[in-house]
């Protein structure tokens, strides 16, 4: 990589660190090209991105961002997974790490908070923003459904009572 390319890459990575909802740093030593391509495609499908960067360039790109505290994670062969949704990147990385022992999560960042590996794992267990919205909508709709059921119940019970009397009269 030439000096101009490095500057451009650092600038691009700096913008990524500033705009991302969450960033996950992991070791990928020993992972095959096929495994990395599979990982990248899964991350892309979920709305995130995976990049491999030189540690020195990543540390330079971190300067002046909220995630500057995670610069100590960049040792060895590291990859950077990020997404605008705070849950997507940790969830995809942890799901992929379950089936692939070559991906070892080191930590990450979410806003100004630097995360260790355990924090990334717990973040991955949280529901996504869309799932939370669906649950909230379900909770809002439930009382209305119950009220409609209670209001409709006496009328249906009355109809059953009249039907039972009608059958009783016919039988008699």
Swiss-Prot record:
Q: Domain of life, per the record?
A: Bacteria
Query: What CDD domains does its record include?
Result: Ribosomal_L10 (cd05797)
Sorted alphabetically, which Gene3D superfamilies does this protein's record hold?
Answer: 3.30.70.1730, 6.10.250.290
What keyword terms does UniProt attach to this protein? Ribonucleoprotein, Ribosomal protein, RNA-binding, rRNA-binding
Instruction: Show the InterPro entries listed in the entry.
Output: Ribosomal_uL10, Ribosomal_uL10-like_sf, Ribosomal_uL10_bac, Ribosomal_uL10_bac_type
| SUPFAM superfamilies given in the database record | Ribosomal protein L10-like (SSF160369)
Mind telling me which GO cellular component terms the entry cites? ribonucleoprotein complex; ribosome
GO MF, one term, reads: large ribosomal subunit rRNA binding
Tell me the GO BP annotations in alphabetical order: translation
What does the protein in this record do? Answer: Forms part of the ribosomal stalk, playing a central role in the interaction of the ribosome with GTP-bound translation factors.
Report the sequence similarity comment from the record: Belongs to the universal ribosomal protein uL10 family.
Matches recorded under HAMAP family:
Ribosomal_uL10
How is the subunit organization of this protein annotated in UniProt? Part of the ribosomal stalk of the 50S ribosomal subunit. The N-terminus interacts with L11 and the large rRNA to form the base of the stalk. The C-terminus forms an elongated spine to which L12 dimers bind in a sequential fashion forming a multimeric L10(L12)X complex.
Protein's name according to its UniProt entry: Large ribosomal subunit protein uL10
């Amino acid at each position: 990589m030439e000096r101009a390319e490095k500057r451009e890459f650092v600038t691009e990575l700096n913008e990524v660190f500033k705009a991302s909802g969450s960033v996950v740093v992991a070791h990928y030593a020993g992972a095959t090209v096929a495994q990395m391509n599979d990982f990248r495609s899964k991350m892309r499908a979920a709305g995130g991105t995976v990049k491999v960067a030189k540690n020195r360039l990543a540390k330079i790109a971190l300067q002046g961002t909220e995630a500057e505290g995670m610069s100590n994670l960049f040792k060895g062969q590291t990859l950077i997974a990020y997404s605008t949704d705070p849950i997507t990147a940790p969830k995809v990385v942890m799901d992929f790490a379950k089936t692939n022992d070559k991906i070892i999560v080191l930590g990450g960042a979410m806003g100004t908070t630097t995360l260790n590996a355990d924090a990334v794992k717990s973040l991955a267990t949280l529901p996504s923003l869309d799932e939370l919205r669906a649950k909230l909508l379900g909770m809002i709709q439930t009382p209305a459904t119950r009220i409609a059921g209670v209001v409709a119940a006496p009328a249906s019970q009355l109809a059953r009572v009249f039907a039972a009397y009608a059958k009783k009269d016919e039988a008699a």
